[in-house]
């Protein structure tokens, strides 16, 4: 019986521009982080990156990433359809719940498809504790892997000075 891998599931990197980005390796840690940031009043300055295998992919491979078929990628229609459903019905819903913003609908959405990848972009302006901020969620799948990249960014909206 082998021991589970005990490496950290979160790391922090600093970009060339000096921005701090939290990088996550699993969905649960990512969602917990978002919930904690909301409780800590840091919800409007968050920059996260999540790289993970979607739950439906792990389920099909019996929770073993080594058993994921090579054909599970952005060229596989079934994978793309299931990923889109996962994003719309689970990931965005979980973000909405973690932020405690039931009115969050992500109506501003787009899809970009190239031979190398598919990208879905979801944007929404929100208000929480009397503070306006923009939420940007970008989900990307690639032609060579079942790994999915999610970028989650919140940016405060500058308050307009009263005349």
Swiss-Prot record:
<dbReference type="InterPro" id="IPR038235">
    <property type="entry name" value="RGI1_sf"/>
</dbReference>
<keyword id="KW-0472">Membrane</keyword>
<comment type="similarity">
    <text>Belongs to the RGI1 family.</text>
</comment>
<dbReference type="GO" id="GO:0006112">
    <property type="term" value="P:energy reserve metabolic process"/>
</dbReference>
<keyword id="KW-1003">Cell membrane</keyword>
<comment type="function">
    <text>Involved in the control of energetic metabolism and significantly contribute to cell fitness, especially under respiratory growth conditions.</text>
</comment>
<dbReference type="Pfam" id="PF10843">
    <property type="entry name" value="RGI1"/>
</dbReference>
<protein>
    <recommendedName>
        <fullName>Respiratory growth induced protein 1</fullName>
    </recommendedName>
</protein>
<dbReference type="InterPro" id="IPR022554">
    <property type="entry name" value="RGI1"/>
</dbReference>
<dbReference type="GO" id="GO:0005886">
    <property type="term" value="C:plasma membrane"/>
</dbReference>
């Amino acid at each position: 019986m082998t021991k589970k891998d005990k490496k950290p599931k979160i790391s922090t990197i600093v970009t060339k521009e000096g921005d701090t980005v939290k990088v996550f390796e699993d969905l649960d840690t990512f969602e917990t982080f978002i919930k904690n940031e909301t409780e800590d009043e840091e919800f409007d300055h968050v920059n996260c990156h999540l790289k993970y295998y979607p739950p439906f992919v792990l389920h099909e491979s019996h929770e073993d990433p080594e058993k994921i078929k090579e054909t599970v990628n952005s060229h596989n229609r079934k994978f793309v359809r299931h990923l889109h459903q996962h994003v719309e019905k689970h990931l965005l819903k979980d973000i909405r719940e973690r932020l405690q913003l039931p009115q969050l609908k992500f109506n501003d959405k787009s899809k970009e498809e190239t031979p190398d990848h598919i990208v879905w972009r979801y944007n929404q302006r929100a208000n929480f504790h009397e503070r306006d901020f923009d939420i940007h969620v970008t989900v990307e799948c690639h032609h060579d892997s079942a790994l999915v990249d999610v970028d989650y960014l919140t940016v405060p909206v500058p308050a307009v000075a009263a005349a």
